[in-house]
C-alpha cells in the first residue's frame, strides 16, 4: 500500500498537468476561432453593405443579379423590399454577433451587452422575415429544395431570436445563453454559405453545381450551411454538464485550430478578390 502511494501521486500530478494544458489549449483555440469568425463575418457584412446597399442608393439594383441571378426583377417591389431587408439586417447581425460572445463585455458592460443584444435580436428577426417574404413572393433560384431549405432556415432564425429575447427578459440566463448560441450558429450561416461555395468551386471546379442551383451539391448546401452549425452548438451546450477527458480536449483544440486555418485562408482569398475591392470602392465614393 505504501509503495503504491508515490505512483498514484505521480499519476495524479501528470493527469493534473495534462488536464490544465488541455483546458488552456481548448480555451485559446476557441478564442482564435471566434476572433477569426468575427473578423471574417464582419468583413462579409461590410461587403453586403458595400455592394447591395450602394446599389440601392445609387438606383442600380440590377447589379444584385451580377452575383446571384434573379435577386432583382422590375415590377416585383415586395420581393425586392424583402430581400433588401434581409441583406441590410443580415449585415448587422454578421458584424455584431461575435461581440455578444465576449465574456469580459458581458461582465463589465452589461448595459452595452443588453442593448447590442436587442439590436442583434431585432436584426435577426428582420433578416428572417425579409428572406421569407422573398421566398413566398418570388421563390429562390434553386427551386423547391432551396425553397424548403431556406424557409426552414428563416423559421429557425425566428424561433431562436424570439427564444433568446424571451429567456433574457425572464432572467433565465442559462437558457438565454443556450438560445443565443443557437441564434449565432444560424446567423453566421449566410457567411459560411459563401465560404463553402467558394472553396468547393475552387477545389472541384464546381462538381455537382449547376447554373440554376438545382444540382446535387446545391441541394446539399440548401441545408448544410446551418444544420451542422446547430449540431456543433447543441453538442457544446449539452457537454458543458459533463467532465471532458484531457485528451479529448486536446483533440478538440487541434480540430478548432484546423478550422481556424481553413477560415483564415478563405477570408484572405475572398477579401483579396471580392470583399476588399467592393468595400474600398464603397468608401471611396463618400
Regions found by a protein language model. Give the residues of each.
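Alpha-helical membrane insertion/targeting regions
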Residues: 2-286
Amino acid at each position: 500500500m505504501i509503495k503504491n502511494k508515490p505512483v498514484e501521486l505521480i499519476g495524479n500530478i501528470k493527469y493534473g498537468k495534462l488536464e490544465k494544458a488541455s483546458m488552456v489549449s481548448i480555451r485559446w483555440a476557441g478564442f482564435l476561432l471566434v476572433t477569426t469568425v468575427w473578423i471574417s463575418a464582419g468583413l462579409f457584412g461590410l461587403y453586403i453593405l458595400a455592394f447591395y446597399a450602394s446599389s440601392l442608393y445609387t438606383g442600380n439594383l440590377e447589379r444584385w443579379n451580377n452575383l446571384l441571378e434573379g435577386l432583382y426583377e422590375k415590377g416585383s417591389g415586395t420581393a425586392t423590399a424583402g430581400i433588401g431587408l434581409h441583406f441590410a439586417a443580415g449585415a448587422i447581425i454578421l458584424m455584431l454577433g461575435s461581440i455578444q460572445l465576449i465574456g469580459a463585455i458581458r461582465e463589465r458592460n452589461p448595459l452595452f451587452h443588453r442593448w447590442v443584444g436587442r439590436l442583434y435580436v431585432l436584426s435577426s428577426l428582420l433578416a428572417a422575415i425579409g428572406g421569407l417574404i422573398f421566398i413566398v413572393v418570388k421563390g429562390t433560384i434553386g427551386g423547391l429544395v432551396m425553397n424548403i431549405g431556406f424557409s426552414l432556415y428563416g423559421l429557425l432564425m425566428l424561433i431562436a431570436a424570439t427564444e433568446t429575447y424571451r429567456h433574457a427578459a425572464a432572467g433565465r440566463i442559462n437558457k438565454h445563453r443556450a438560445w443565443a448560441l443557437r441564434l449565432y450558429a444560424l446567423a453566421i450561416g449566410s457567411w459560411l454559405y459563401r465560404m463553402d461555395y467558394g472553396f468547393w468551386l475552387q477545389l472541384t471546379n464546381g462538381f455537382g453545381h449547376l447554373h440554376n442551383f438545382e444540382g446535387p451539391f446545391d441541394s446539399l448546401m440548401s441545408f448544410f450551411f446551418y444544420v451542422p452549425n446547430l449540431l456543433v452548438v447543441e453538442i457544446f451546450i449539452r457537454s458543458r454538464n459533463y467532465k471532458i477527458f484531457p485528451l479529448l480536449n486536446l483533440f478538440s483544440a487541434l480540430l478548432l485550430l484546423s478550422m481556424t486555418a481553413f477560415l483564415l485562408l478563405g477570408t484572405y482569398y475572398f477579401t483579396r478578390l471580392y470583399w476588399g475591392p467592393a468595400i474600398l470602392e464603397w468608401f471611396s465614393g463618400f
